[in-house]
UniProtKB/Swiss-Prot annotation:
Domain of life: Eukaryota
Keyword terms, alphabetized: DNA-binding, Nucleus, Repeat, Transcription
Gene (UniProt): TBP
Subunit structure: Binds DNA as monomer. Belongs to the TFIID complex together with the TBP-associated factors (TAFs). Part of a TFIID-containing RNA polymerase II pre-initiation complex that is composed of TBP and at least GTF2A1, GTF2A2, GTF2E1, GTF2E2, GTF2F1, GTF2H2, GTF2H3, GTF2H4, GTF2H5, GTF2B, TCEA1, ERCC2, ERCC3, TAF1, TAF2, TAF3, TAF4, TAF5, TAF6, TAF7, TAF8, TAF9, TAF10, TAF11, TAF12 and TAF13. Component of the transcription factor SL1/TIF-IB complex, composed of TBP and at least TAF1A, TAF1B, TAF1C and TAF1D. Association of TBP to form either TFIID or SL1/TIF-IB appears to be mutually exclusive.
Compartment(s) where it occurs, according to its Swiss-Prot or TrEMBL record: Nucleus
Gene3D superfamilies tied to this protein: TATA-Binding Protein
InterPro entries from the UniProt entry: TBP (IPR000814), TBP_CS (IPR030491), TBP_dom_sf (IPR012295), TBP_eukaryotic (IPR033710)
Family the UniProt entry places it in: Belongs to the TBP family.
GO CC annotations on file: nucleus; transcription factor TFIID complex
Protein name in the entry: TATA-box-binding protein
Major location category of this protein: nucleus
Function: General transcription factor that functions at the core of the DNA-binding multiprotein factor TFIID. Binding of TFIID to the TATA box is the initial transcriptional step of the pre-initiation complex (PIC), playing a role in the activation of eukaryotic genes transcribed by RNA polymerase II. Component of a BRF2-containing transcription factor complex that regulates transcription mediated by RNA polymerase III. Component of the transcription factor SL1/TIF-IB complex, which is involved in the assembly of the PIC (pre-initiation complex) during RNA polymerase I-dependent transcription.
Sequence repeat copies, ranges: 145-221, 235-312
Length: 319
């Protein structure tokens, strides 16, 4: 019998030269590296995948934060530009004119989520306006003149000691004040007479009374032997007052019109409002009393009150 046929069936493939290369039966030799002929399988590391996903997520968050910061900067720049233009209009007025009156006008800006508004309450910018209706039509209040200050030149040098000794109702103390203080009863006024010949008359309630009183003082000086004249009579200041009949929130008024007003209750109980046109100074009290001073003519007193009355109504105190 043949030798190949005597081998068992499981060893027949090993005896033949082709059997050594039979697929499905791997042969390992000492000269062949371990793993030769094997198909490598890809290995996936779950830890490396999670790290990549975390990095991508952080990059996306950083991009979103940068976009939000850019939007905030753009909106802040736009609001700053609006605020600057508003302040320029408040100081210059329309078409380069000086504003006559100012009141509060809220500027609405939509803040970004999570940000604080740029305008803290109650600070609001100011824009010039003109009242739509005169105060005389809506209130019927007419300021009353309380004092008129006028000046006149007597045109000669005066001996104040002689005037004080010979004239009635006259006093002179050069250590305290270098002028003769003279008073008359009708109209009830007071005059300050200086040695240069200048005279100041105060206390009159009207323009006619002020002129009449100044002429009476000049006549007294003439009777004392001085060549007094009546030159350059001029009204220097008029003071008026009125009552609006309702209390006023002075704190809100000074915050809204802080460019033109000052309020120090520890020093003076009234709010001082300096109007630009007409150039009048107003003393506003919480009780509703208003004093107007600095006018040269009566019409300026009335015009200033017409301008301020609508503002005072806006700050009426509710009880």
């Amino acid at each position: 019998m043949d030798q190949n046929n005597s081998l068992p069936p499981y060893a027949q493939g090993l005896a033949s030269p082709q059997g050594a290369m039979t697929p499905g039966i791997p042969i390992f030799s000492p000269m062949m590296p371990y793993g030769t002929g094997l198909t490598p399988q890809p290995i996936q590391n779950t830890n490396s995948l999670s790290i990549l996903e975390e990095q991508q997520r952080q990059q996306q968050q950083q991009q979103q934060q940068q976009q939000q910061q850019q939007q905030q900067q753009q909106q802040q720049a736009a609001v700053a530009a609006v605020q600057q233009s508003t302040s320029q209009q408040a100081t210059q007025g329309p078409s380069g004119q000086t504003p006559q009156l100012f009141h509060s006008q809220t500027l609405t800006t939509a803040p970004l989520p999570g940000t604080t508004p740029l305008y803290p309450s109650p600070m609001t910018p100011m824009t010039p306006i003109t009242p739509a209706t005169p105060a005389s039509e809506s209130s019927g209040i007419v300021p009353q003149l309380q004092n008129i200050v006028s000046t006149v030149n007597l045109g000669c040098k005066l001996d104040l000691k002689t005037i004080a000794l010979r004239a009635r109702n006259a006093e002179y103390n050069p250590k305290r004040f270098a002028a003769v203080i003279m008073r008359i009863r009708e109209p009830r006024t007071t005059a300050l007479i200086f040695s240069s010949g200048k005279m100041v008359c105060t206390g009159a309630k009207s323009e006619e009374q002020s002129r009449l009183a100044a002429r009476k003082y000049a006549r007294v000086v003439q009777k004392l032997g001085f060549p007094a004249k009546f030159l350059d009579f001029k009204i220097q200041n008029m003071v008026g007052s009125c009552d609006v009949k309702f209390p006023i929130r002075l704190e809100g008024l000074v915050l809204t019109h802080q460019q033109f007003s000052s309020y120090e209750p520890e020093l003076f109980p009234g709010l001082i409002y300096r109007m630009i046109k007409p150039r009048i100074v107003l003393l506003i009290f919480v009780s509703g009393k208003v004093v107007l001073t600095g006018a040269k003519v009566r019409a300026e007193i009335y015009e200033a009150f017409e301008n301020i009355y609508p503002i005072l109504k806006g700050f009426r105190k509710t009880t």
